[in-house]
Amino acid sequence: MHVTVVSPEQAVFDGSADAIVAPAYDGQVGILPGHAPFLTLLGVGVLQVRQGSASTRFRVAGGFLQVVGGGGGGETVRIVADRVDAS
């Protein structure tokens, strides 16, 4: 699935991922290929973008996460955070 992570200042990640773990406003959410279309508000915490055995981490605060095009692995995950820092 294709993932973009942006803040008001910059795009911090644009690439493919096997899994995402994100801090939603009411608890953590996991996104895998084949996930249904989805929209949630982000809370404060660590966002993990997993690519095989590697994991890229960002500290995020506020914003939203959207999954579009759910189904056969062609999803796009958009993460627009009010604040993003490398973790």
What kind of feature is each model-predicted range?
Residues 2-87:
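Compact, glycine-rich, soluble single-domain proteins
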